[in-house]
């Protein structure tokens, strides 16, 4: 990932950061956005670089060895089935025009089932962290990164 490369560039060493830790928060953010857009948000797979930055700032990060994000019988990530359930739950909340406490339990149970339970604390290289404290220990400031977009209808 880009941030792992940044850590190398900064002289922080090699890290294997958990992509799925960020993906879980990405889906939670998409569900919120979809609800506020009356069902017109994007609940699909994939994202943009600011999605990673936002999730990192919200919940932190963990090493891959702490959160693999595969909690089912597969060696590779396959979110097709999970995304169908995400869409079903997200669209049901929109149709009902409310999100009950049970809705949030269902969403978190869905992610726990497919991605695994989130660690509140973990030990990495002999030191105890929370996802937020681990993120802080990396020294990555998301405000140091900007996104650029090139479009065909504007000159370079």
Where does each model-flagged region fall?
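Catalytic-core signature of thiol
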Residues: 3-156
